[in-house]
């Protein structure tokens, strides 16, 4: 087909769609996101068993999350830059495979040091997948990018929520212990095979070079830096709760299985919030959605920690929807602030969220060791509080990219 992008994802001359998004491309990208984040999301469910096996302190538990988050975050902008300059659709199947294989290795590692190695490689797989995946999710979304990105993001949300349940099924329900963690790799390997066949179709959505150059002139680094500060502070709540909910429920006298179910509730609520947040942002504006979520999050978190019981679980559900549900909104905003560097914007937005979340996990682990887990969880509410002021200062984006390109006819792919 004349003008079609190469399978490597190089920009080409392609036709435009009007308003909709390509369901075939989105299904492939969201499935890969689900499998990648399922592997990453399984780690907290394994932490109580790793803690018991290697007699870990809370700080050492937090260090595992730090390794996972740093390895999956620091290198993301580099992958995004590679994507913007040369195209790197091959990162999609490679990343999702490595994410699962790393966790599988960590679950059967004979020492704490080798657990760290497995977690490290899993994080690199996560880092490889996200910039390219979110970049092409934007391309296949048409003009409703927040809505489209919410569908891509909800794949990750569901993966995070399924991760603890899948790991617990093999580790606890089937009584396999940590050896059951090897099965976490299976979804990623299956989805990687599907992504290999989807690459030519996805490549047809890459924008023309002329459009990329025009968009680069509108890059807003000031707005980007302010948004990244918001993303980092939001991670204090997101990753802090994500890491310590299971351990907090155990400290309350509940079992490990119950703690895993509470974590799944938090994450599934985030998936629902994502599905609502994207379309709502397209309708009423990105900043209004961010601001509303940051206003309601602190009291909801405090209610979960201080009240507990059914009321606490309901509060945690809505906290998950508010905190996690704005992820797709901030991701689209980062791409709108850097329209000529969509891969870099995606890598910075996702990478910083993960990386600072790891620092938050380690810091909150130290607070839990020095004081208690309740105090550490209450500290997670501070991030959204600061985000309220920063959100009010966010500028409007100067550039709006045209609706994404139309895919080639099936016979030409």
Q: What does each model-identified segment do?
A:
Residues 41, 69-77, 161, 267-275, ...:
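Residue-level signature of mid-helix packing/kink "hotspots" within the transmembrane helices
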Residues 43-44, 222-271:
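Extracytoplasmic gate region of multi-pass secondary transporters
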Residues 55, 87, 108-113, 142, ...:
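Helix-breaking motifs and short loop linkers at transmembrane-helix boundaries and internal kinks
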Residues 74-113:
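Conserved MFS/SLC helix-loop-helix module at the cytosolic interface between two early adjacent transmembrane helices
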Residues 90-104, 288-303:
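Structural signature of the two symmetry-related core transmembrane helices
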Residues 118-155:
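Cytoplasmic helix-loop-helix junction between adjacent transmembrane helices
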Residues 152-200:
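Helix-loop-helix hairpin linking two adjacent transmembrane segments in secondary transporters
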Residues 185-209, 388-395:
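C-terminal membrane-cytosol helix-exit motif in multi-pass small-molecule transporters
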